[in-house]
Amino acid sequence: MSHTTHPYQKELEVATLAVKRASLLTKQLSDSIVQTARSGTLTKDDKSPVTIGDFASQAIINHAIKLNFPSDEIVGEEDSQELQENSSLADQVLSLIIKIQQETSVYNDVVGTLTDKNKVFQSIDYGNSQGGSKGRFWALDPIDGTKGFLRGDQFAVCLALIEDGKVVLGVIGCPNLSENIVSNEEHSGVVGGLYSAVKGVGSFYSELFKEGTEPLSQQKPIKMQNHTNPSQLKVVEGVEKGHSSHSTQAEIKAKLGFDPTTVAKQTVNLDSQVKYCVLASGQADIYLRLPVSDTYREKIWDHAAGNILIYESGGQVGDVTGAPLNFGNGRTLDSKGVIAANKEIFDKVIDAVTEIRKSSTPRV
């Protein structure tokens, strides 16, 4: 299928502009939080900035989807109850939305505008779909990587289209991701990346804060590397130890033959689905997210867009057994953990995980 002819042209345009608008809003908010924190006026327990960002981002994107595809359902992370019970918070959310709509008014014809609180509430609550294995729905994470967002570090706005349980389109806006983040040069390249994938077409990179949309034929195709030598491999993992088992992941790297003296330099810790983007663009080779408990189930919005980005860039994604992730099971994945890697090394990673699982407690 060519870059210019695919059946998701309109969906990609809407998703791109909505994610761009939401990314700009969340970037501005994140930057202001960091400034406030530096001045000492933001307390550690103050969750309102990220709450405002989550609500505003979800409202913008859900509204754009429903405006263009009224029969589509959306699986979103938030609902509007807290906002409806807090008038001050709702005012702040609406104010931010109106401001960003004015700044990106060239997008209004495609993604629409929100002008009152009731419409904001309604748009947020469009995200109440339960998903499933039949039909068509979108999966949205309005701010993926809350801690990174609050630190002014990595976070992402993630949107995927799922048809009959299969991801067919993904768009990830990474406001603080530089094009060559894993290189030795500190934050080299353009900051702010948009990563897109369409089933059967490929994965692509473009500048997030460049106005408008470019056809895929004008975007930069991205491909995973096929490194297999342990000395060449780079691993991306989460920052938060509560989200994945770093100790088990260390065992896996040892089993794969990583040199203990260099393994730290070969491991990159990043928040959010930014990890998938780094992998898909060939800057890393393995993504490890091993479960911290036997009962934890991943949310589909945390992985759907990243999943197609990896496949369309030539990689492979699975759970700890190597089985593909199932996005037709409702709002959560019925699987343990997530592992992504280039196709040359994927089976070896799964073999290492299997060996460690056999010799460990049932948790892994």
UniProtKB/Swiss-Prot annotation:
Record: residues binding AMP: 243, 272, 275, 289, 302
- Residues that bind adenosine 3',5'-bisphosphate: 146, 243, 272, 275, 289, 302
Q: What are the BP-aspect GO terms?
A: amino acid biosynthetic process; phosphatidylinositol phosphate biosynthetic process; sulfate assimilation
The UniProt annotation places Mg(2+) 3 binding at: 77
Task: Give the enzyme's EC designation.
Answer: 3.1.3.7
Role? Phosphatase that converts adenosine 3'-phosphate 5'-phosphosulfate (PAPS) to adenosine 5'-phosphosulfate (APS) and 3'(2')-phosphoadenosine 5'-phosphate (PAP) to AMP. Regulates the flux of sulfur in the sulfur-activation pathway by converting PAPS to APS. Involved in salt tolerance.
Q: What family, per the record?
A: Belongs to the inositol monophosphatase superfamily.
Q: What is this protein called?
A: 3'(2'),5'-bisphosphate nucleotidase 1
As recorded in Swiss-Prot or TrEMBL, the protein's gene is named HAL21
